Amino acid sequence: MLDVKLLRNNFEEVKQKLQNRGEDLGEFEKFGELDKRRRTLIVETEALKSQRNEVSQEIAKLKREKQDADAKIEEMRVVGDRIKTLDIELREIDEKLDTILMSIPNIPHESTPVGESEDDNVEIRKWGEVREFDFEPKAHWDLGTDLDILDFENAAKVTGSRFVFYKKLGARLERALINFMMDLHSNEHGYEEMLPPYMVNRASMTGTGQLPKFEEDAFLIEAEDYFLIPTAEVPVTNYHREDILKAEDLPRKYTAFSACFRSEAGSAGRDTRGLIRQHQFNKVELVQFVKPEDSYAALEKLTGCAEEVLRRLELPYRVLSMCTADLGFTAAKKYDLEVWIPSYDSYREISSCSNFESFQARRANIRFRREPGSKPEYVHTLNGSGLALGRTVAAILENYQEADGSVLIPKVLQGYMGGIEKIELPK
């Protein structure tokens, strides 16, 4: 949520920045009109209250002097009724303004590239060499089926499309990746480990920005009004909802493994095969709470933590700075990490690392005090995938495949796999 004072004092500047996002400005313009009416009502109400006070004093004086006060009493009744009417309208406008405010996205940071589509995202750097195969490489869904480590068919029978059973060494590979990522982030990168709830309430989804605008993308348990989490970002960020933190306790850095649940409502027909776009998938998340002046340096470090996972797995990747049109609702600046997937002959997103500035903190009321007794300020929140597990498995299977259909295990994972160096075809 944006600072309402910023909207009121810099309306045209904010409007231009939202235009750079490609936003429909209808609601934003409505905010300006309603806010103008609100200011008019406040001025009128204050004038009427002042008039009421004056009339009240006049009535008291008339009564002390034993004079007829009926006309003044009637005047005060009319003024009072008008104040009540204006107060009702003011409350209704405030409710409408709050609703609109929750639907306005974050303002892009000045360093975010201005663009109209994903084609305008800017490549920052690349790492690793894309492998040249001397045989026809298979897609990960075929490799997983042939190796008997991924079963999409029975998952479709048990649940439906966009689900998978990990089996045998496939399940062990996923578990190895989880342990490797969590160990790296907690032992070397200084993150505190968490295992969060997989269901959250409506206030939590609102706090991180999924609600109210993107409710159709979420899985709702209607009987309880709980949501299955789309990412561990939601419970971990809301861990500090309504908290006032101490300055000396910042930054707070958390890493959390969780299952993630997404309806993929807007993705019909896209990535229908394999692990790239599932309704349920595992992910390791990185979340930070920092002082405002530290958030952009923190974003660079957080992105580096996600990159380190790919480097140790020796998977080729690139980093993109996302343009204003591809920024997402909550971020002021976002980097995407894309890993090379041979079956797509392209890089595919495996992590997003974002600085939300105070956008989420305002929605969730997460603040800190610089000194005891000082006025609380909003923290800046950041998060990043460190990494998405299904896409990491897909990248490993495709990039580490051999001509005989087997798949090598990345060296950094072999200790987590009990020394297994290769997944071979069943005999």
Curated annotation (Swiss-Prot):
Xref: InterPro entries: aa-tRNA-synt_IIb (IPR002314), aa-tRNA-synth_II (IPR006195), aa-tRNA-synth_II/BPL/LPL (IPR045864), Ser-tRNA-ligase_type_1 (IPR002317), Ser-tRNA-synth_1_N (IPR015866), SerRS_1_N_sf (IPR042103), SerRS_core (IPR033729), tRNA-bd_arm (IPR010978)
Annotated protein name in UniProt: Serine--tRNA ligase
Sequence positions that bind L-serine: 231-233, 285, 385
PANTHER family from the UniProt entry: SERINE--TRNA LIGASE, SERYL-TRNA SYNTHETASE
Enzymatic class: ligase
Any one GO MF annotation of this record: catalytic activity, acting on a protein
Native source organism of the sequence: Listeria innocua serovar 6a (strain ATCC BAA-680 / CLIP 11262)
Similarity-based family: Belongs to the class-II aminoacyl-tRNA synthetase family. Type-1 seryl-tRNA synthetase subfamily.
Cited Pfam families: Seryl_tRNA_N, tRNA-synt_2b
GO cellular component: cytoplasm
HAMAP family per the UniProt record, alphabetical: Ser_tRNA_synth_type1
Keyword ATP-binding: yes
